[in-house]
Amino acid sequence: MNNAVKEQLAELGIEGYLNQHQHKSLLRFLTCGSVDDGKSTLIGRLLHDSKQIYEDQLAAVHNDSQRVGTTGSRPDLALLVDGLQAEREQGITIDVAYRYFSTQKRKFIIADTPGHEQYTRNMATGASTCDLAVILIDARKGVLDQTRRHSFISNLLGLKHFIVAVNKMDLVDYSQDRFEQIRAEYLEFSKHLQGETEIQIIPLSALEGDNVVEKSRLMDWYQGPSLLELLEYVDIDRDKSSGAFRFPVQYVNRPNLDFRGFAGTIASGVVKVGDKIKALPSGKTSTVTRIVTFDGDLPQAQAGLAVTLTLADEIDISRGDLIVLESAQVDSTNHLLADVVWMTEQPLQVGRDYDIKIAGKKTVGQVKAVRHQYDINNLSTYHAESLPLNGIGLCEWTFTQTVALDKYLDCADTGGFIIIDRLTNVTVGAGLVRDSLQNITGQTESFSAFELELNALVRKHFPHWQAIDLSRLGKA
């Protein structure tokens, strides 16, 4: 048991502690930035100074610091996060490491992401589930290419809150001039980011603990809050609940003849008993009669809650369908524009079929064209025929089925999809819907009778090839 938990138990008792803990809000955030900017050390300092480290963990860090540490005689707090042997030996982060901690005000899940360019795909994976990005900048080096890359990816993935932590201020003698110079440089770069992003910039030293949990006495020129205070008070609940109601159906719950409910997690917005809803893509309408949870029925539920909805009418709804309010206008299309983050050595190929998973629905899609690829360093675009490993570009997609979807910036769950290689079943990329385009219909007219017959023969005798049913292309 760590010291923070001991103190809260002594103050509140077991029941009081559990009740308070259950009702705390949860913030998921990631640390990102260039190599050796101090991401893992910052997380280690945050855990250490907020009394979230167990005694055996601290003893192990002291022992490992003598062998593979990079901080001399002091404990290397980065070792609290870097768990892989290769990470400890090289002093770098490779995989995304997740850590959990809580304070009296909030619960946190931290994703420590790698800074090397070759591991950009790992960083994008970590950012995809987060609400906030802590972007580290080395005070000696300033804004680097990887700083811009990670800022752009975080922005592309819809993160609306950035905390830019200018780290290693102790190595520039806590210079206010140096901090202001970096601050101005980053704010100038941020003008090119899309959407509305709240940016807070803070000077700190992860190694010394300045402005991490407690305010620094060596930077009295900085009058803002510490990093932990910013994390505790940022308002992310409003972002999720203010959107339109979206409920991707994950499972049809029918334990007996008298109950039929639709289970899933609310992606955005709020639903109440009595609300008029419709199911997509069918368009059938009904009324919500119950909102069922493990702890009992609720009068209303908001984004993030896992619930089962029961309806007044027996309408056909299955896994992958989307439940929205009856008045909602939702695009249903098989033709769209999406930003793609490519995550494998083999480049994205125009015209090749990939499995697509979006909000519980599975279909097949292919890229008709790569509109452009992004230059991460200056956020400009240039012509490209395909996307390489870690490449990011805007692509035109067609799906074999009509899919109800949103723009990614409006709702990540219904606007984001993963791209899967049909032969290896490996996730090769992530797509973020930019806009829907006019449906493509009548695709079967381009196939001859011989092609359709051959396709049917291949699917019958070689099902492991996962060939598309050409006769169904263009059908919903």
From Swiss-Prot:
<dbReference type="GO" id="GO:0003924">
    <property type="term" value="F:GTPase activity"/>
</dbReference>
<dbReference type="InterPro" id="IPR027417">
    <property type="entry name" value="P-loop_NTPase"/>
</dbReference>
<keyword id="KW-0067">ATP-binding</keyword>
<dbReference type="InterPro" id="IPR044139">
    <property type="entry name" value="CysN_NoDQ_III"/>
</dbReference>
<feature type="domain" description="tr-type G">
    <location>
        <begin position="24"/>
        <end position="238"/>
    </location>
</feature>
<dbReference type="Pfam" id="PF00009">
    <property type="entry name" value="GTP_EFTU"/>
</dbReference>
<dbReference type="InterPro" id="IPR044138">
    <property type="entry name" value="CysN_II"/>
</dbReference>
<dbReference type="GO" id="GO:0004781">
    <property type="term" value="F:sulfate adenylyltransferase (ATP) activity"/>
</dbReference>
<feature type="binding site">
    <location>
        <begin position="33"/>
        <end position="40"/>
    </location>
    <ligand>
        <name>GTP</name>
    </ligand>
</feature>
<feature type="region of interest" description="G2">
    <location>
        <begin position="91"/>
        <end position="95"/>
    </location>
</feature>
<feature type="region of interest" description="G5">
    <location>
        <begin position="205"/>
        <end position="207"/>
    </location>
</feature>
<dbReference type="InterPro" id="IPR000795">
    <property type="entry name" value="T_Tr_GTP-bd_dom"/>
</dbReference>
<feature type="binding site">
    <location>
        <begin position="112"/>
        <end position="116"/>
    </location>
    <ligand>
        <name>GTP</name>
    </ligand>
</feature>
<dbReference type="GO" id="GO:0005524">
    <property type="term" value="F:ATP binding"/>
</dbReference>
<keyword id="KW-0547">Nucleotide-binding</keyword>
<keyword id="KW-0808">Transferase</keyword>
<dbReference type="InterPro" id="IPR011779">
    <property type="entry name" value="SO4_adenylTrfase_lsu"/>
</dbReference>
<dbReference type="GO" id="GO:0097216">
    <property type="term" value="F:guanosine tetraphosphate binding"/>
</dbReference>
<dbReference type="GO" id="GO:0070814">
    <property type="term" value="P:hydrogen sulfide biosynthetic process"/>
</dbReference>
<keyword id="KW-0342">GTP-binding</keyword>
<feature type="region of interest" description="G4">
    <location>
        <begin position="167"/>
        <end position="170"/>
    </location>
</feature>
<dbReference type="InterPro" id="IPR009000">
    <property type="entry name" value="Transl_B-barrel_sf"/>
</dbReference>
<dbReference type="Pfam" id="PF03144">
    <property type="entry name" value="GTP_EFTU_D2"/>
</dbReference>
<feature type="region of interest" description="G3">
    <location>
        <begin position="112"/>
        <end position="115"/>
    </location>
</feature>
<dbReference type="InterPro" id="IPR041757">
    <property type="entry name" value="CysN_GTP-bd"/>
</dbReference>
<dbReference type="InterPro" id="IPR050100">
    <property type="entry name" value="TRAFAC_GTPase_members"/>
</dbReference>
<dbReference type="GO" id="GO:0006790">
    <property type="term" value="P:sulfur compound metabolic process"/>
</dbReference>
<dbReference type="InterPro" id="IPR005225">
    <property type="entry name" value="Small_GTP-bd"/>
</dbReference>
<dbReference type="GO" id="GO:0000103">
    <property type="term" value="P:sulfate assimilation"/>
</dbReference>
<dbReference type="InterPro" id="IPR004161">
    <property type="entry name" value="EFTu-like_2"/>
</dbReference>
<dbReference type="InterPro" id="IPR009001">
    <property type="entry name" value="Transl_elong_EF1A/Init_IF2_C"/>
</dbReference>
<dbReference type="Pfam" id="PF22594">
    <property type="entry name" value="GTP-eEF1A_C"/>
</dbReference>
<protein>
    <recommendedName>
        <fullName>Sulfate adenylyltransferase subunit 1</fullName>
        <ecNumber>2.7.7.4</ecNumber>
    </recommendedName>
</protein>
<feature type="binding site">
    <location>
        <begin position="167"/>
        <end position="170"/>
    </location>
    <ligand>
        <name>GTP</name>
    </ligand>
</feature>
<dbReference type="InterPro" id="IPR054696">
    <property type="entry name" value="GTP-eEF1A_C"/>
</dbReference>
<comment type="similarity">
    <text>Belongs to the TRAFAC class translation factor GTPase superfamily. Classic translation factor GTPase family. CysN/NodQ subfamily.</text>
</comment>
<dbReference type="GO" id="GO:0005525">
    <property type="term" value="F:GTP binding"/>
</dbReference>
<dbReference type="InterPro" id="IPR031157">
    <property type="entry name" value="G_TR_CS"/>
</dbReference>
<comment type="pathway">
    <text>Sulfur metabolism; hydrogen sulfide biosynthesis; sulfite from sulfate: step 1/3.</text>
</comment>
<comment type="subunit">
    <text>Heterodimer composed of CysD, the smaller subunit, and CysN.</text>
</comment>
<feature type="region of interest" description="G1">
    <location>
        <begin position="33"/>
        <end position="40"/>
    </location>
</feature>
<keyword id="KW-0548">Nucleotidyltransferase</keyword>
